Amino acid sequence: MFFCTIFAEDKLHSAICKQAYIALVCIIFAKGKKEKMIKDNYILPAEWEEQECVQLTWPHKDTDWAPYLDDIYEMFVNMAKAIAERERLIIATPHPEEVEAMLYPCLSEKAKENTKIALCPSNDTWARDHAPITLRNRENGELKMLDFKFNGWGEKFAADKDNEIGRRLKADNILTAEMEDNLDFVLEGGAIESDGKGTIFTTSQCLMAPHRNQSMTQQEIEEELKKRLRAERIVWLDHGNLVGDDTDGHIDTIVRIAPDDTILYMGCDDKEDEQYEDLKAMENQLKALRKDGGEEYRLLKLPSPEAIYDDGERLPATYANFLIINGAVVYPTYRQPKNDAEAERILKMAFPEHEMIAVDACAAIRQHGSIHCLTMQYTKGKVKK
């Protein structure tokens, strides 16, 4: 009996010690995890936050722009002027001397000083999708660039040179922030929108499209987005794909996020328009969307441009594809005075303190994109020593 009592007491003591040990390990693990979260306290800033610079990847004769280079050059010069007057501008191009000769006579002295032309081979011009995505640390302001794989929107187009541009700019010390390798995951900048508070907006049409991250489920992709972008919440939109959009439904053509929990979106009031039903379904999804606290978002509806065609093909013209820079919004126009003016009016409601700068985007839309697609902003912050 004595032996049994001692054995039982020893067994109980052992069990208590084991539980205490497990509890201690859990506390240490949780503490370490918390410290790691604090150390890696990064977030994807909203586009309207202060920027360091914007990247353009200049068109050239060896791209699909060859048939109408003069028209697209004029548009790029207008974008460059608007940007370089307000912040630094990086231009990636395989032909630096040609770009300088074309651009510099059109720039003020201030804009020239703000412009850096970098030698970079390129397949195309869509900086939004091949440039790094920049995070900023919420505590110390340090920057981290995420280098994702760009594969020509699901292997539709050649992208080998474009996929190297960010790393080349980093190697040449033109981009100076720390760069994190995410080349095992396909993601384009035009596929995501951030509110700067931990919520990322995207579309299921794009991220679930073939030849991007094919073997992954939507839930798995969501977890990857949260991990890589340091996001707390992913909002998936399931409607709104524009006719002629070869990105498989980038969110920056249909829905944009603005300050004060405002969502700008492309509307359509013409029931005869082939895009009406899908855009209406998207509108209804946005109306049902709630913030984390249960409140509604402020919704502002942008007009739809009248249908634009090129050789019988409808082009994905949209007013949602604007660029926010320091102190200004650079927005596309389509030579449709009534719609262009209405778009500016709505944008001014979302950005009342910003100057509105109109840029004719008729040349860009011939290649199925617009101003936001052609640019990538780099947020202002500190570079890790």
Q: In which residue ranges do the predicted regions lie?
A:
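The feature marks the mature, well-folded catalytic cores of soluble enzymes
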Residues: M37-K385
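Intrinsically disordered, glycine-rich low-complexity segments
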Residues: G32-K34
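Intrinsic-disorder-associated, low-complexity terminal segments enriched in Asp/Asn/His/Tyr and depleted
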Residues: D10-H13, Y21
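Low-complexity, intrinsically disordered tandem-repeat tracts enriched in small residues
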Residues: A8-D10, I27-A30
